[in-house]
Structures are given as C-alpha cells and as structure tokens.
Swiss-Prot record:
Protein's name according to its UniProt entry: Myb-binding protein 1A-like protein
PANTHER family linked to this entry: MYB-BINDING PROTEIN 1A, MYB-BINDING PROTEIN 1A FAMILY MEMBER
Annotated compartments: Nucleus, Nucleolus
Modified residues (Phosphoserine): 810
Protein keywords: Activator, Biological rhythms, Nucleus, Phosphoprotein, Repressor, Transcription, Transcription regulation
GO BP of this protein: rhythmic process
Comp. bias (Basic residues): 1177-1195, 1221-1232, 1256-1269
Bias-annotated ranges (Basic and acidic residues): 721-730, 1199-1211
Family (UniProt): Belongs to the MYBBP1A family.
Amino acid sequence: MVAVMQTDMGETENSAVRPKVTDAKGILKQNRQFLDYFWDIAKPDRQIRLKAIEDLINYLKNSEQADELKYTLKRLVDGLSHTREDARSGYSVALAQLLSVFEEISLKSTLNSVKEKHNLLTASKKLIRNAVFGNFFGVLALSQSTRLHKEPQVMLECVQLLQSLSEYREHLRDLPRKTMVDILSETSQDVFEEVLFSALQSDLTSALKSPEQLELLLVALQKFPSVLKPKKLKKLLGTTAVITKQNMPRLVEVLKTAARSVKKENILPAVALDLLQVSLREDNFEMFWTDAIITGMMSEMPGPTHYLSFRLLGASLPLLSIPQLQFVLSGDVMRQYGEHTMSAQMPDRFKFAPEMAGYVGEFMQSCTDPDKQLVVVLGFTQLTNQGNPVVPSYWKALENMHPSAVQRYVDWLIEAFCKPQLENCLDFSTRRQKGNQEAAVESESCVSRFRKWIIPRLTFIVENQQIKKQEALVMKVVRFIFFHAFFEVKKPTSEIPETTQALSVPINQQTRTAVVSGFYSLLQALNSMMVLGESVEVQGLNFRRIVGVQADGSMWIYSVFQFASMLLNQNKYVKSLQSFSPEQRQGWDSVLESVEALRKKAKTASSPEHTAFQQLFLLIGIQMFTSPEESLDLLKDLQTCMEKAQAKKSKKKKATDEPHWVEVIVEILLSLVSQPSRLVRSVCKTVFGRICPHLTQAALSSILNVLDPNKDEDESGVVVTDDKKRKLKEEDEDDDDEEEDDDNDEGDDDDDDDDEEEGGEEGEESSDSSDDEEEDEAMEEGQEVDQNFRLELMKVLQGQNALATEEDGSDDEELDDAAMMKLDGSLASLFLEQRKKIQAKKDEKDRLNKEKGLVRDFKIKVLDMVEVFLSKQGFSPLVLGMVEPLLSVIENGMSSESSQPEQDYLRRVADIFRNRLCRGKFYCKEIDGREAELHEMLERLIGRAQKLTDSSVALYYFSAALYVLKVLRGSVVDQELSTMGKVEVERATTCLKNALTSFMTKRKSPLTGAMFIDLFHRFPVLCVNLMDTALENITAGLRDHQQGQACFIMLKALQCKHVKNLMTGEQTTELYKKVVDQLTKSLENVQCKNKTAHDKVVKALELCLHVVKIVLNQKMRVNLELLQDVLASMNAEGCLEKTGKLEDTYWSVMRLFGVIKPKMEKVKKVPEAEQTEETTKKKKGFLPETKKRKNRKKPTILEGKETETPVEKTPEGASGEGKKNKNKKKNKKRKQQAGEETQDQPTPKKAKMQQQQQQKQKKKKKKKGADGE
C-alpha cells in the first residue's frame, strides 16, 4: 500500500520504503488522548473546556508517570499567555484545579515559572500584551487554588506582582485591583497585618485617587476593622474617617470616575455601595447622601452619574432604617428619577424604570418588616408628576407585600382619594411641561389625576392573586369604589362607613367616569377570582376550580347587590346619582326577591340553572345604574323566563315539549353579549355553560343564525342599532366625553364655517388637499358624477354670461367686478356642495365598515358560546345540527376576499370546527331514528366536497363526512373492526367510491389523496371495499398525478394492519396478484419527461418495494417475473445508475431480486504531454495565462448562422488551463445551440455588444501576432 501511494505521488520507484509503525502497547493512542485534553481546554465552548479540565485531572490522578504531571504544569503555564481570551481563561482554570488537587506542586515554584515564562522585562513590544496576560492569569490561578492563604510569602509576591501589573491598564483595566480585593477577602487578619499591610500601604495611602484603590481600602476596612483603626486611617488618609467634609470632593470625583467606567455595563460599581455602607457604619449617611450624591453627582447633566445615583438608591433600600428611607425617598434623587421616567417615554431613550422596579421588588421580597415595606411603597406612590404618580397603577413590586402592610396601604389610598394632600407628595414638572404651561397647574386637575390613578391601583390589589389579602379587605375596596361610582353623601352615618369619609374636593364627572369603569373592571376580576383563605374548605373549592364566590359559597356580585340595596334604602344619608323611576325601583326589588328565592332553592336542591339565573339577575340588576331602561326590559324577559322554567318543572310535562325558557334566556344572552364589556362577556359565557344541558334545537338555531352569512344584513342592522343606542346613552351620562366630542365637532364645524365664510388661506389649503380625494371618488363612482358636476358648472357659468360661445363671441373681459364677485360666490358654493357630497359618501363608507366591524365582533363573542357548548355538550345530538351551518360560514369566508380581521374570525371558526367538533373527545352516540338523516347528510357533504374549487374548503367538508361516519359507527374496539355500527356499508361505499372515482378521473378535483388515506386508516372496512377502485386507477387514472396518488393510496392501505386483519389469506394473495399486474402495466414504457411523471414512477416503485418484500417474505404464490423484466428494462441504457430518490428506490427493489447496483468506475484523466523546457520557459514581457483577463461575454449566435470561435494558441505549460477553457467553451457552445431554437433576433443592445466584442478579439489577435514576430 505504501509503495502504491508513493508511486501515485510521483516519487521514484527505487525510494526506500518506511517500516510499518505498530502500536501494540497503545502508547501512541494513550499519548494522543492525553494531548487532546490541552486542545479541548483552549476551545471557545465553555462546556467543552470544563469537561476537558475534569477529564485531565482524572487522567493525571490515575496516571503513574511523573513526567506527565510536569508536562501538564509546563503546558498550562505556557498557555496562560494565549492570544484568545477563552483559551487563557481555560488554561487558568485548569492550572487552579491542578494546584488544588495535587498539593505536592509548590505554589512558589509555579509562580516562579509564570514569572520566568512571561517575563515583563525581556518581552518585546509585540509580545508585552501576552506577557501581561500570562502573569495576571497565573496569579489568578494561584488565588483560585484555595491554597494561597496557607503560604503568606507567595501571597505577598502575588500581591506585589498585581501591583506591578496595575500599570498596564490599557490591557487589564481594573482586573488586578479586583483580584487583590478577592485575595484580601480570603485572608486572615494575622496574615494581613503581618504580611500584606506593609505591601499594600502605598495603595491604601492613595485610596482617594481611583475607584480600584478606594475599593481596596473599603474592603480592608470591612474585613479588618481592628487593624485599620482611626489612628492608622489618620496616617493613610489624613482623617480618622472616610466620610468627612475634607474627603468629600475627592470621593465625588472617584464616584464620577466609577460611574463613567460602567457606562456600557449598566451596573452599580461595588465601590459606591461600599462607600454607602461605610457611611452607615460611621453614622455619616445623611452627609454622604447630601454632599456626595445630591450636591456632587446630581449636579451633573443627566447621564451616568444620575444612573449611578438611581442604582445606589435602589440598592440602599434594604440597608436603611425607616427615617433614612423617608429622607432618601423624599429627596432630590427621587425627584430627578421621576423627571427621567417621564422624559424617557420616547422609544429610543434609555429607560431606568424597569431596573428600579427590580430593585424595589427584591427589597419587598427580602424585607420582613411591614413598616419598611409601607414606607417604600408610599415613597414611590407620592412621587407625582402634576398629581399623577410616576409608577404605574399595575406594579408587580407589590406582590410581596405583607398582609398588614397591604391593609394599611389600602387605608392610606382610600384616605388619599377622599382627602388628597398633594402638598405631602414629591410633585414635579418636566422641562417641557414648565415651558408649555403659562400659569400654575390647577389643583383640581392634579386631584383628578391623583384620584384616577388610585382607583386602578386599588383594583390591581384586588385582582392580583399574588398579593395576600383577606375577604374583608376585598369587600372594603369593592364597597368604596361602588359607592363613589354611583352615590353621593347627604349626611354621614356610622351605619355606612363610606359616608364618614368626607370629600375635601368634590368628584368631577371625568373622575366619576373613571371610577365607574374601575368598578366594572373590579367586578370582572371578582367574577373570575379564586376563593381567598387557607382553610380546608377553601382549598377544596379551589381544587374544584370554583371561582367568583366567597368562602361561604355566596357570590361576590351578590354581596355587591346587597350593599347597593342597602344604599338605595338609605335615602336620608345617601343619594343615588342614577335616579330610578317607580317602575325601575319595582324592577330592582323584584330582582332581590327572585335572587333570594333562587338562593333558598339552591340550598335544598342546587342545580346549574339556579346559579345561572342568579348571575343573570344580579348582573342585569347592577347594570341598572348605567342603563336602567334596557336593563328593565331584560329583567322582565328574564323574570318571565324563570317563571316558565319553574312552571314546566312543576307540571312535569313530557320531554318532547320544548322548554321555552331556554330560548328566552339565550336571546337575553345574545342581547347582553352585544355590549362591549368584558364583564358581560365573561358572565354570559359562564351562564351559558350552566344552561347548556337544557339547550334545545330552537335555542341553538338562534345562536347559529347569528353566524349565518346569508342573514348578515338582517342581523347586523339590529346589532348595530342596539349598540348605537347604548353608546348614545352612555355618552349622555358622561359629560366629559360629550365635551370632548363637542369640541371635536365644533372644530369640524369651525373648519366648515371658515371654508364657507372666509374662503381664505385655510379654505384654499383644505380645498387643495381635498382635490385628490375628489378625483379619487370621482374615479370610483364613474363618469356619471363628473358629468352631473360638469352640467351644474356649465349652468352657473352660463347664468352669469361667463362662458364664451362661438355665436356671441364674448369673453371674460366683459364681466365687471360685481359680476365677477357674484360668479366667485356661485362657484364657491357649487364646489362646497360637491365636496360635501363626496364627504357624505366617504362617511357612509366608514359607517358601513364600522357596522361590519361591530357585527364581526358580535359574532366572535357568539363563537364563545358555540365553543362552550361543544366543550361541555359534545355528546349531545344537537351537535349534529351545527355541522353544516359552520361549514357554510367557512365556505362563505374562504370564497370571498376579506380583510385581516375577517380572516382572524374565519380562522377562529375553522379552529372550533376542526378541533372542538370533528376531533372532539366526546361525540354523539344516541342517534336512534336518525340513521337515514345522517346518511343523507353524509352524501350531501361528500357531494358538496366534489363540487368545490378550493381544496382547503373541501378538506373541511370531507372531515365533516368522516365525523358523520364516526357518529354512525359508534364506539368500536380493535377486536370489532369488521362491524360498522349503524353505517349502511353499501350506501356509504357507493358514495365514497364515486368520490374516489371523481378524484381519479376529474381534471381539477378539489379532493386530495390525503383525504382518502385518512378515511382508510379510520375505517378499514370501507378501505377494503374501495381498494379495487384505487387499484384500477393505477393505470386508469386521468393523469400521471392521479396514477401516482393511486399507488400511494394503495401503499398506505396495504401497510394498515387493520386492513390485513379483515382479509383472508386467499383474498390477500389475490389482491397482491392484481397489484403486481397493475404495476407491471404502469411501469411499461414509462418515461420521466416531467416532474409529475417522475413523482408517479417514484410512488409506483415505493409500492413495488413493499409488494415484493411482502411476497418474498411471506412466500406468496405470486408471479414476479414479468414485473422483474419490466424493472430490468427500465435500466437498459444505464440511465438509473446515478443517485436520487427514484434511482435509490429502484435499486432497493432490484436488490430484492438479487440485482445489485453496479459500481461506477472512475475514469482517470488522460496524462498530459510532458512539457519541454522550451515551452515551459517564460518569455520576457509576457503575462502568464492566469493573469490575463478573460472575456466572459460571448457573442450571441444569430439563427441560421454559425460563428467560428477563434482558436488561441496556448503554451504547452498551460495545457491544464487550456483544457479547462476548452470545457467551458464546450458548455457555452451547448447553451448557445440550445438557445438558437427560441432566439429570433438580438436586441439592439446585444448587437452593439457583439460588435464591441468582435473588435476586442481582432485587437487581441493583432497584438498576439505582433508579439510573436
């Protein structure tokens, strides 16, 4: 082998052959493994480095050779100066581990080796950086070996070396100082006093010059306070303490330097926090905070110094006492933080608020003192921007508050709402606000902003499940918000605690609207809140996921309703903002009576419908405070509905009678769900889930009619009208919203008045800006609008005699000034009228779009009810009536071009249909008497699927058909696969056979092969009946695609184990004979002329592979000779000897017949003629062939003509290059000849380029001829 390799490499035949190297003892392999560890230690991947270090240490532990340990130490010391950072750190960690495990290695000798290998004095300028890193990482390894404190002299040398490395700051930055701090933190007091203090004295003396040196002093002070006593500190710094007036300017400069050094890292320098701790120990915190932070750091422009102050504020919270916290949280640092938070709202600006929230969250989590927690939360709450607190109402930092602190905080919020004391807040205005405001900010607006912030904060405390609270606290918040949303105090009374807290400033309408909104948001949270408490009963309720109730089982909304009833009966002390008429008040009392009656019945015999009626009564009753008229109508319907439901139960009518109360309650739910309220939507969804078992076909039809696309026009008008009426009533109640709308309308009217009366610059600009809109609208409406407007314009001009005619020969100069003014007025009014018409059309279009959006939103809410019904009552026979309506929605939506919201709605419908209905866990099993109806539905679904044009829609119809088949078959175990339940097998087979035939013979069929494969897997009995049809179409299919799909379907059918179990041995053998015959016919004279034919052959070969394998393994009596001959003829010309899916499948089949794919013989390149010295010798003045510019653009060959390619003589020495050029020319010539058939004439641009290329070639020929001479 070696001799052959030498011959191939061109060596002489007489050269000596090396003896074969043997490694019988495995020494080479062992050494290779050992050396690989060092390669892995230097790799960038951290996990690989750590694994290599661990393996190296284990290898050395088990090794018996001392030389390997020495080599490892030398190799690791050498690697400390590696050019890559990852490699340096890897070698350093490995060296630290080595020194830690093998204590026989001397630290002294190791340090000497590091100094000797990476000598800073003898290193060149180019290598000084590597030497610096080598020394530093060597010391770092020694410090991490956990042995350094045992050898003080080595520690001293390490510290001295680190001091010398501090000069190379451009390479190491502050790493030497940090390492010295780490060494100090692990040093005992005796070693520090006896050994290190003298060495570090120079650094400690200059501690106020840099952050690193100051950090060294602060760590020494913290670790060795008995050594660095005031007397020694006096010698070092000149003062007996660090925090003094004398040292303050230098401390400020050090802090500024530290702030700038971490500008990119966004972290708090350790020296700042250590300084703060020193100030606390020296009892000089207020002086440090005032002089160093507020006066020194905050005097700078906003930037790194401010951010350091903010971080120090957040980090200091766990360290401070309550007076110190109050001092810090009411100072200038907090004010500056507030200004930064408000001015950093722009997207590209740095935002510190998330970082501060993290500091506060960590403090709240670690602090166990409720008083401190309350002080911090109040400090951030009282940081206000013109009355509006800076922190958001929804603040996750409150999640770890102590329950007692939460109680006191809620009391403070309630008191602040009633009697705001903004003078106690740390209020500020940003620079932009100061510049924009002409006068002082009104106190009432500040109070309004503060109150509108308090309500969401109270709501958040109740909503957040992580905040620990009691039911009494929740009820207190609910009562407070409800009272101030809908009532006013006439006279305080102790019976109503809410009346005892008088309002120092009356609540304006804008604030009242916010309180109402907050109440409904709170009610929504209560409706979905888990039971509060830690008792066993509470845990049982939470385990059953019962929400919206208190520990005693009563609903939260019922407690609110009781409180409201009590307030309505206390007319002497409180006044309702919503005055009720006698009829409305009677309706309220009837609600209370109905609810009490339902509660009594629920105690004796609880049922879901009782709870559903209670929720509806209470919800509609509460809504009487916002929309009494609509609520009263709903209450009457609901009352009648409940009476009929009870009457039906008492009379015990037959089950065939339709319970009308369900239909009424569904209509009420549909009416309620049209309102844009999360609370109403949630309650309606819950109530509908409870009445699902009683739902009837008529009630379900009323829900499906909403989704019916054919009834959009009728239903949308009702929904939009109801919604608009409700909105108008809300706007009548909300004066503030009215004012804003009026302002906008007045602004619009003013613009119109300016256009009509002044006709000045603004009118001209607006008319100019609307010209494009007029033209666009005119183009959309067609030419008729333009003609009408043109006629009107002609009439105006003719009426003023301003239109020149051929008869009178008049012109514009005949009009006097008065006529011209009159003409201008007429034209202005005409154009204004035209613009109003265009605007009216645009408004109408916007109105229609808005109506469509409202209808779509309403349908999405109704889909919630459909989803709830399918989830809870998937086994109900009513589900069968939902199949075709949902399919109608899907088909209509996919057949029309729709916007993104419409597509989202359609996607929701399709998801519910596919996952909740067709693939639902439960399905209808009670179909007695409905078999004929279901078979007709099956035929309709399959027939409709064949008539569609979109395969995606057909897939939903086909899935629905499979669902109907599943319902008809019922539940079947694997042992009873031959039974099909109540399916009429012949009828179903005929229907599906027609569909399969249509798929195989129709040119553009919406059906796909995947549909039938799914059918075959789920219903093996039908698969057996349809296999003959699929088998016939292997050759009878309309196109290659259908024939390939037939092969694929047959392959999946034969692979199905359930199909095998349904067939006898003789049937299976006969089937395989037919398959072989069909495959033989299909593969005769096959040609892969396009991709479709190619795919068909691939699928046919895959079927062949399965069939041949089964026939041979089971030794069936099936003749495979004809198939083998056909397969052999496919490769008669050797065209299937390449690689590819088709070729690989083909040879897999042939391998079963014992035919192995022939190996491709590599054709060796013909040896080129030997170059003579004359031809290889370069002539002077000639460029080599590799340097010559190639002309890549070849002229285009005209049709019917041939161009002679110029033959360039190349020197023999460049024969390889010449051969490559020849191959390229051949390829280009083939492409040109292929293009002759389709190319008629060259474009002018190509012709011009051809002339230029021909001229260049002529010049080259001339130049070569001259050179040759």
